[in-house]
Each structure stands twice: as C-alpha cells, then as structure tokens.
Amino acid sequence: MTNMELAAKVIQELVHTGVREFILCAGARNSPMVHILDECKNLKVYSFFEERAAGFFALGRIASTRRPVAVITTSGTAVAELLPAAVEGTYSSLPLIMVTADRPKHYRGSGAPQTIEQVGIFSYYNEVALDLDSENSHLSFKSLSWKKPIHVNVSFEEPLIDGPVPQIHIPSVSERTKLPVQIPLGTLKEMETFVNTHKPLVMVGILPEKAYGTVLDFLKQYKAPVYCEGISSLRGHPDLKDVEIRSGEKMIHRVLEMGVCDSILRIGGIPTARVWRDLEDKYKELPVFSVSFNHFTGLSRPVQHCNSLDLLSQVEFSYPHHENVKVNIEDAARATQIRQLLDKYPDSEQGMIYAISKRMKGSSVYLGNSLPIREWDSSSSHDFPPARVAANRGANGIDGQISTFLGWAHPELENWCLVGDLTALYDLSSLWVTSQLDAKKFRVVVINNGGGQIFHRMFKKEIFINKHQISFESWAKMWNWSYDKWHTIPEDNKELNLADHQIIELSPNWEHTQEFWKEYDLLWKE
C-alpha cells in the first residue's frame, strides 16, 4: 500500500464515521493527507500553524456541531502539543480525533530528527490508540463510546508523495455507531427513591444543548430550590423564576444550614461552585445523587450516579418539592442587596460584569476561566439571559480558551468571550483562524486586572498573582482586530459601536473591587 493510499484510507474511514471537518496543521510528514484534503472541496478544512490552538479549536467545533472533528499533525513535538486538548476532551466527553503522522516504525528509539515515541503519548487521555503503516492498515471506529479522544498514528515512508491523489467519497449518511448508553438496572428506582425521600437542592452545571429541554422540564415539575450555573445556559430562564436561587452560591450554604434541603442533586457537568468542593469535608455526610453525561462523579467519596441525562424524563414524583417560600423570601432580599452593591460600585469587576451582561441577551457567551465564571455567576443579570453559554470545565485549565470559543461560535449570533488577562496571554495565536470562520461577530472581552487576581483573596501573597502592566492593544493590531479599552461600561447600546472583530480590554477599578468584596462578605454575615 502506498502512502497516498494509506492516507486516503484513513481519511475515508473518518468521513464514513461522521467527520466532516478537519483541522489541518500541515507539515512534511503529513503531506500525503495534506494533498488529499486540499483536493477534497466537499470537506471543511481549517488551516492552523500551531497545534495546541488547533486542538482546542477542534473541541469548540465538536461542542458546537455535536460531531467528531479530526486534527491532523505532522510528527515530533507537534503531536505533544495536542495533549492539553486531549485532557480537556476526556473530562468534557468530547470525541477529538487526533491523527498524527509519524516517521517509519524502524526509526523508533533511534533519536533521529523529529522522531519521538508517539504511540501511547496520550496515555489515559484517549479511548483507543491505533498504530498504522502500509503493512498494518486496518482501522475501525465501531464499538466506541465516542466520549473520549481517539488517537490514530500513521507512519509514512519516503518518498512521501508516492502516487496520484485518491478521491474521497462523501456519503450522505455516516456510519458512526455509538455504544448504547447503559443505565444500570435499578438506577431509575434509586433516583425516584432519592427525590421522593429527600429534600435536595438541585445544582445544574454545564449541559449539552440537546439536553436543555429535558432538564428544564424536570426542574419545572420537581419544584425544588435550584442553583443554575451560568454555563448551564438555564440561569435566568423565566420558567424557573419561582425556584431558582438568584443571590449567588453563598445562598446554597444558607439553604443547607436552614435545613430546607438535606441533600444535593447534581445535574450536568461537575459544578464550579465552592460548595461542591465542600462536599468532601464540611458537608461530607450530605447525600449526593448525580445525573450527568459521563461517568465522572466529581467527588472522591462514593455517591449515587447515572451517566445519562435521559433518566430525568423517566422519573416519577410521589409529590413535588415544596420548600421554596422561605428560600424565595431571603433569596430575593439578598439578590436586591447585591444589585444595590453592583450599582454602588459600577466600575468594580463585578459591576462591570453586571453591566456588560445586559448587552448579551440572546447572544452566545463563552466564559473563559475560573474568575470570569465565578463573577458571571455572582454578578451577571438574570433578566437578560444569553441564548447559549459554554466553557471548558473538564480540566478547568486556562489554556486554549479563546481557541475553543472561536470554534464554538454561532454563525447567526453575536458571540461574546469573557477571559482574564493571563488566560488571553496563554492563547495569543488563537485569532489566526478568524478569516476562515462562518461566524462574523466576535467580541473578546479581556478583564485586565494586572494578573491572576483570583489568588489575591485565597493566599494574600503577591507571588501567586504574576502581576504585569501589559496592554492588549498591540495584540488586536497584530491580528487586525478593532480595539477598545473600557474603564466603565457604556450605558447606551448606540455608544458601543462594535466592529465585527472586536477586542475590549476592561480595566476595573481596583479599590472599588475590593470595597465591593468587603461589603459583599459583610452582607452574608448578617
């Protein structure tokens, strides 16, 4: 089998299994695949020069399209650059397919140029690793769960281009087969027993878009107090106004301390709220039942768990949860006090998040790392909910965030991304792909507070913060994006006057931010 035939076989099998988009990091060793994809005009091919950004961009495309996406790299350290995306894809259950070109197998262990041990490099972070060459070209993607990345390593001999370019057939129907989700016998009964014998507080984390309706219907029927994180895309939903906690995650502690709720029902991804970590110690005796889209429980202790959100549509209640009146009264009062604080300190980080969130109703919003996520959950307006919200919360890293956002962006919506300054610095090459995208309206908002200020309240030591005085204006100029720096949020939409490709650098008032936190903490001590 020639190199060109082997490359065509791999690409054809990927197409048969449902791949319609390829992220191509062209090099010499993967040139057989480059030639084939360049001739195939019926497939979407994105061109990248940097593999780490390419991997995270692919995760965004997978999250947006709900189809597997393949990244193709050359050999050597280019392969290693995909590891961060493979880690995130594993914990987010996104089927990233990593196709890595390799030098012939007899070079392994030799230390020859651009020769590393590529097979097994992703260790735990792939569902299967296939090692192909002209003598061993069998590959199949059947009987996979499609909930973890997949590694296909392909060795090519020289000369690399050793024949004509084969044609790729694009079938009208893909043949990807998924293992049926196995809900263990008795799990439905276990959950019905849990919700009918406990008084849980419901915490909703990140959800696949197809699950929004199922989860919303369950919450409306069950009527338990519910804390919807922003990344659930259900925060501020009008159908939940009588059950949703709107004063922030500290109210969860109040609900548990008042005895209104005696357990936690987690729905969706692992929550970002601090109270979830407290389930390991402070609330270690509290019963927990998790209903998610993968097998990760998010806790080190044993809990009841189901890895299918479809279970929610099958649950029958003996009676709905009716513990909301007392919670609603206190929650509404505290939410009003918090809004007063936000109005009092409009140029604090929290006040700026509150104000800018009012511009995002019906938009796509991507939250890029820990601090923006927490500030969005504590401070954004419930009255102007976005159409969709997302984040990379599998491994909770700050790398590749803007690349993921660009992959996830919706072609028909205004797309906002909120990131911290260090997160933006991690992904400066991300804007490379902009000219290749169907989506047009991008707003990357960089909260520039001079370093990793999430650590300021945690450790009180400057060494954790990585202080800097960097401006992002040159970054915008480098990629020909428009740039604005805001010390306060414009009050009138007409004043925004945003370009299609817009970087907004927020410069919060440090003193106002600290005063906000002081008064916020005092509010919860009352």
Swiss-Prot record:
Protein name: 2-succinyl-5-enolpyruvyl-6-hydroxy-3-cyclohexene-1-carboxylate synthase
Signal peptide: none
E.C. code: 2.2.1.9
Pathway noted in the entry: Quinol/quinone metabolism; 1,4-dihydroxy-2-naphthoate biosynthesis; 1,4-dihydroxy-2-naphthoate from chorismate: step 2/7; Quinol/quinone metabolism; menaquinone biosynthesis
Record organism: Bdellovibrio bacteriovorus (strain ATCC 15356 / DSM 50701 / NCIMB 9529 / HD100)
Cofactor note as given: Binds 1 thiamine pyrophosphate per subunit.
Keywords in alphabetical order: Magnesium, Manganese, Menaquinone biosynthesis, Metal-binding, Thiamine pyrophosphate, Transferase
Gene3D superfamilies, alphabetized: 3.40.50.970
Cofactors demanded by this protein: Mg(2+); Mn(2+); thiamine diphosphate
Protein origin, superkingdom: Bacteria
Homology family: Belongs to the TPP enzyme family. MenD subfamily.
GO molecular function: 2-succinyl-5-enolpyruvyl-6-hydroxy-3-cyclohexene-1-carboxylic-acid synthase activity; magnesium ion binding; manganese ion binding; thiamine pyrophosphate binding
Subunit architecture: Homodimer.
Catalytic activity entry: isochorismate + 2-oxoglutarate + H(+) = 5-enolpyruvoyl-6-hydroxy-2-succinyl-cyclohex-3-ene-1-carboxylate + CO2
Gene Ontology biological-process annotations: menaquinone biosynthetic process
Purpose of the protein: Catalyzes the thiamine diphosphate-dependent decarboxylation of 2-oxoglutarate and the subsequent addition of the resulting succinic semialdehyde-thiamine pyrophosphate anion to isochorismate to yield 2-succinyl-5-enolpyruvyl-6-hydroxy-3-cyclohexene-1-carboxylate (SEPHCHC).
